[in-house]
């Protein structure tokens, strides 16, 4: 019996050792699983945080693009309003030659050209429709210069020095362009009631 007791004792010790190894293995597995779960949660949190950042960046990018598109459209509308305003203005002044005040305006425009080219031998460039008014203005002012009927304009004139190095544009179109170039913001304010509409 001692032999059987010895075997039972060995089997019992082996069983205990086996159970202890299994318990230790289970504890290690549980620890590994907890650690893996913690790491998984951390990785998940990192990916979630990155996804949130990416969404915020994309949202901001989309907002920026939308704002740019709105600004572009507003700018196009403003430009169209300005273009329309200048077109209407040009239409209104296209018949200025028949206005009784045109000779006085033409004289003032001529004096400005002459003044801009003071000290130079002057050539006036006029529209053939203004030849009589130009002659009358030159007679009235006593200014002597060459006249070339070589431009087409709704009104006004331009002048050059004889060598062509100096030019003075004083047509109504050139004056409107100068106004357009220097007064766009003011025009927008008048049309829309402020720089931002």
From Swiss-Prot:
Subunit structure of this chain's protein: Has multiple subunits with at least A(3), B(3), C, D, E, F, H, I and proteolipid K(x).
Protein name in UniProt: A-type ATP synthase subunit E 2
Biological function: Component of the A-type ATP synthase that produces ATP from ADP in the presence of a proton gradient across the membrane.
GO cellular component terms, A-Z: plasma membrane; proton-transporting two-sector ATPase complex, catalytic domain
Alphabetized UniProt keyword annotations: ATP synthesis, Cell membrane, Hydrogen ion transport, Ion transport, Membrane, Transport
Membrane topology annotation: Peripheral membrane protein
Family stated for the protein in its record: Belongs to the V-ATPase E subunit family.
Organism of derivation: Methanospirillum hungatei JF-1 (strain ATCC 27890 / DSM 864 / NBRC 100397 / JF-1)
Highest taxon of the lineage: Archaea
GO molecular function annotations of the record: ATP binding; proton-transporting ATP synthase activity, rotational mechanism; proton-transporting ATPase activity, rotational mechanism
Alphabetical GO biological process terms: proton motive force-driven plasma membrane ATP synthesis
Keyword check for Cell membrane: yes
Localisation: Cell membrane
